């Protein structure tokens, strides 16, 4: 299983749930091992692989059905495929899996050639799910066209992100960033949704004002090469750091001065919760649900605003003094411990119901 935002959220829950009561197995749509596979196996789970999701492929649907049919021990199937969440739930229903959860993670989708197909399958989710979850209100209402769903917070282990000046100094030294430099950061997959093209345009403008500024991009994805080409064409290659996938995101956030997130759409991004937990000012687009604001560190601009406006705001936010926000994150309901306990109890109660023990 890869190291994206959704996968990170699932691992946060998996690490903190009582695995003597609830165990997770993961079915992924990639035919190769991912970053989290070894940890999942070490924690007692299994990782199974299918080919890329293709609802029009007879062989794909056959493989999916055969997998579920071969695992009658599963009484709960929890699907995290957004618009396509109903597809595995359809075969779970056909194979008499009693508890089928669809989970919404986005408040829209990329409007590409697949968009009409996604909307078609979105309409069929509720036919096959008997429980609806969402990462936030906007995501749930968009995905399910109802307000009858449970919001499960994209919770994190907030203590791991608490601002630490020593870590900040060490990480900036590691990347050769001086104390007087502005370090802008972003964590996210190189995918159209994350709007890296505009992000680079914003940084390019900031760099004209502040030549001693840097941009750190954490992640991988299909658009990484084209973004690297754009950075090179703008002459910014010495000031843009591509870290790739990292297991120390909590420490990288300490090194940043402003977290930039100009997405085209989102559900409730866990990366914004992580950034706030690190006491990091966040500048987000008006397409990111404002419900992600759990502290006074989140600021919003329109995607229609100029790159000058965005660059000016980054400069302003870079002067904010960092602080410990752990209690604020905990009080907002986004610390993982209580959330994992709730999910554990939910699964156990459902399982008992499925076995007729209640």
What are these regions (language model features)?
Residues 27-28, 272, 281-285, 290:
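Short hydrophobic beta-strand element within catalytic cores of glycosyltransferases
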Residues 79-85, 104:
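Short His-centered aromatic/hydrophobic patch
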């Amino acid at each position: 299983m890869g190291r994206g935002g959704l996968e990170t959220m699932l691992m946060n829950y998996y690490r903190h749930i009582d695995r003597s009561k609830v165990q997770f197995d993961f079915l992924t749509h990639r035919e190769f091992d991912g970053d989290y596979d070894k940890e999942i196996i070490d924690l007692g789970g299994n990782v199974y692989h299918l080919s890329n999701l293709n609802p029009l492929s007879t062989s794909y649907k056959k493989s999916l059905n055969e997998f579920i049919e071969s695992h009658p021990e599963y009484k709960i199937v929890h699907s995290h495929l957004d618009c396509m969440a109903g597809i595995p739930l359809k075969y779970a229903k056909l194979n008499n899996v009693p508890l089928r959860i669809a989970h919404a993670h986005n408040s829209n989708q990329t409007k590409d050639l697949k968009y009409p197909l996604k909307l078609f399958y979105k309409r069929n989710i509720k036919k096959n799910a008997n429980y609806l979850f969402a990462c936030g209100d906007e995501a749930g209402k968009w995905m399910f066209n109802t307000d009858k769903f449970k919001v499960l917070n994209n919770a994190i282990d907030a203590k791991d992100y608490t601002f630490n000046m020593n870590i900040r100094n060490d990480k900036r030294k590691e990347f050769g960033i001086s104390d007087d430099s502005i370090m802008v950061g972003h964590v996210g997959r190189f995918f159209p949704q994350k709007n890296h093209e505009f992000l680079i345009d914003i940084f390019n403008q900031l760099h004209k004002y502040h030549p001693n500024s840097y941009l750190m991009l954490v992640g991988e994805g299909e658009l990484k090469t084209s973004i690297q080409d754009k950075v090179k064409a703008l002459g910014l290659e010495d000031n843009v750091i591509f870290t790739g996938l990292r297991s120390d995101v909590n420490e990288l956030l300490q090194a940043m001065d402003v977290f930039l997130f100009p997405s085209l759409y989102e559900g409730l991004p866990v990366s914004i919760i992580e950034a706030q937990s690190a006491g990091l000012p966040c500048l987000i687009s008006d397409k990111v649900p404002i419900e992600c604001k759990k502290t006074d560190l989140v600021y919003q601009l329109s995607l229609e605003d100029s790159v000058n406006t965005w660059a000016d705001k980054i400069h302003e936010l870079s002067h904010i003094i960092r602080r410990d926000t752990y209690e604020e994150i905990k009080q907002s309901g986004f610390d993982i411990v209580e959330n994992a306990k709730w999910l554990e109890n939910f699964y156990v109660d459902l399982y008992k119901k499925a076995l007729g023990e209640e």
